[in-house]
């Protein structure tokens, strides 16, 4: 086993993990409870964050995708969730529910937390703009 397991993580993965942490912190500040991070179903996909939102009458299981974009010329971070990516997330969420039947009666929602770096006049990156899109897309009948 390597002395420093972090060496096995690519710089892009390390950066993505930082944005996932920012998103997890933000969502928890909004009252959601984190129950899983980077949940994977081999050969199917990965869900960045799985959280529970407690309501007065019901609980919602939230599957959150975290995205970061550097340039707006290609659309913001939220626009980067293609139909193909949506299908992959939905399929992975179905596997999550099979592995965790304790959440079978929860309503489910797919959210996206996006971070977009604005480029200023100097060409330097400016502070990130973040967005939380609740119910970013719908899944066909479960």
Curated annotation (Swiss-Prot):
Q: Which SUPFAM superfamilies does the protein's record reference? A: Restriction endonuclease-like
GO: which molecular function terms?
Answer: nucleic acid binding
Q: Name the domain of life.
A: Bacteria
List the InterPro entries hit by this protein, alphabetically.
Restrct_endonuc-II-like, tRNA_endonuc-like_dom_sf, UPF0102_YraN-like
Report the family membership: Belongs to the UPF0102 family.
Q: What is this protein called?
A: UPF0102 protein PsycPRwf_0497
Protein's organism: Psychrobacter sp. (strain PRwf-1)
